[in-house]
């Protein structure tokens, strides 16, 4: 995946107004990110490594936080809306114990959303005609819709818990 930008770089981005749909066809917009603590992660269901590892790590983190995680919302936002339909995302996220909310929609709107958070995403075409996506992988933490911190894919479970507990 693309090297994670440093935290100051990600913190310089503020998100943007948007309207997309989640995997259950509910409208998701910038107000959906309001609340005590929200985590957003941009990824895709065909990702061979970093996305499933990050989601698995966050699943364990949320389980270890147990009752403390009740105020935490976690959104998985697809950078591959062409393949990641609501049904595909719902099926993919059903592999995890915690309630991750999958978001997909119009590719142009998705592009603007991930750019607004400083996330980089690029299609890499393979010899067989298929493609992979190279993208940056921070788990971005928000409080009342505003950036407060991030978890890198390099942060282990213990460090990830410590980062989240700081804001719960």
PLM segments and residue spans:
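Extracytoplasmic/secreted envelope proteins and their assembly/folding machinery
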Residues: 55-62, 86, 90, 107, ...
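Thiol-/selenol-based redox modules, centered on thioredoxin-like
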Residues: 127-168
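Short loop/turn microsegments at loop-to-beta-strand junctions
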Residues: 15-16, 38, 136-137
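N-terminal "domain-start" segment that seeds a small globular fold
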Residues: 2-32, 56-57
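Short active-site neighborhood of thiol/selenol oxidoreductases, capturing the structured segment around
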Residues: 30-54, 58
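Short, internal strand/loop/helix patches
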Residues: 90-136
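Conserved helix-turn-beta segment immediately C-terminal to the redox Cys motif
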Residues: 36-37, 54-77
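Thiol-based oxidoreductase modules, predominantly thioredoxin-like and allied folds used
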Residues: 71-84, 99-108
């Amino acid at each position: 995946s693309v090297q994670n930008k440093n935290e100051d770089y990600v913190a310089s981005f503020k998100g943007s107004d948007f309207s997309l749909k989640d995997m259950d066809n509910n409208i998701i917009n910038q107000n959906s990110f309001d609340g005590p603590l929200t985590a957003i992660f941009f990824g895709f269901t065909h990702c061979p490594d970093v996305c499933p590892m990050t989601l698995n790590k966050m699943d364990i983190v949320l389980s270890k936080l147990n009752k403390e995680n009740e105020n935490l919302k976690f959104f998985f936002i697809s950078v591959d809306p062409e393949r990641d339909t609501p049904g595909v995302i719902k099926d993919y996220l059903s592999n995890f114990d915690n309630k991750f909310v999958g978001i997909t929609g119009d590719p142009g709107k998705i592009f603007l959303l991930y750019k607004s958070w400083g996330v980089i995403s690029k299609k890499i075409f393979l010899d067989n005609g298929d493609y992979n996506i190279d993208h940056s992988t921070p788990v971005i933490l928000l409080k009342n819709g505003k950036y407060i911190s991030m978890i890198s894919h390099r942060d282990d479970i213990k460090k990830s818990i410590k980062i989240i507990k700081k804001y719960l």
